[in-house]
Amino acid sequence: MSPSTYSITFACYNAVHYTKLCVDSFIKHGTPLDRLIVVDNGSTDETRDYLQTLPLGGCIFNKQNLGCGVAWNQGALVQQAEWSIIMNNDVLVSPQWVESLIDTAKQNNLKIISPALIEGPQDYDFDEFTQVASHKMKNTLRMGNPHAVCLAVHESVWMDIGYFQAMPKLWGYEDTMFFHAARKAGIPMATTGSSWLHHFGSITQSEMKRERGLQDKQGLGGRHNYRYLNQSWLARKLQKREKVRNLKSWRTQELAQYGMTMHGVRKNGDFKWL
């Protein structure tokens, strides 16, 4: 696959340690840094100095934290590739993760696709795990269920529904609004077991909560953000019920067939499958 087929972007805000781990995993597995666009949302630690040492495809330094939606749009618009991969910076990638992600999307006519995830502490051999997991679950899909830790978006999607809501006060609700618009437009999307990431766990949001004196369980966004979806109470409730039912069904089927699922959490040195 030609690297010009895709462009990768992530936003960062402080927590330079996790950005370094992410970039190091790119280098380790041959993901070209000239296809990576980093948008720094006003970091005050060593993040900016570090980014300036890298041979990136582009780097944008915002004066203040403009939120995910603005940053993701800024990054996606730099190289304007056929596929834009929007991801968190607190992740580790695995061998052939981009190729597996996009090849699976093409084979299944998907326009938005996310990789499978392990979340929590990285207290296991992730590379060894993914060699087995990506082969075992390469043909498995959770249709209609991508996630914002990482998503590859085909260029046709931007033309159909537009980009992310560029509203800083949303504080993390941008992905919900984007997926809602995609579902309304009938855009095919899924999570695949052919590509895997390790996700340390919403490090940027945790940093912003700490600065604002919020508890971990508290949300950053406004409690009435759901109004932006223009959904009735009943529609929201039915959609949530369907999602819970689907997640339960996927978990049951995947455990029965593979002894694992496409979403795991590390807890007490073991995997908890969701």
Stretches with model-predicted labels:
Residues 95-127:
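Conserved donor NDP-sugar-binding/catalytic core segment of glycosyltransferases
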Residues 150-153, 157-162, 168-195, 201:
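A short, conserved alpha-helix in the catalytic core of glycosyltransferases
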Residues 84:
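Short aromatic/hydrophobic "clamp" motif used to bind/position activated sugar donors
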Residues 40-49:
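A conserved acidic beta->alpha catalytic loop
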Residues 1-25:
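N-proximal low-complexity "stem/linker" segments adjacent to membrane-targeting elements
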Residues 62-79:
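Glycine-rich, basic loop-to-helix element that forms the pyrophosphate-binding segment
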Residues 124-148:
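Short, flexible, basic/aromatic active-site loop/helix in glycosyltransferases
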Residues 24-33:
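Short, acidic, metal-binding catalytic loop of nucleotide-sugar glycosyltransferases
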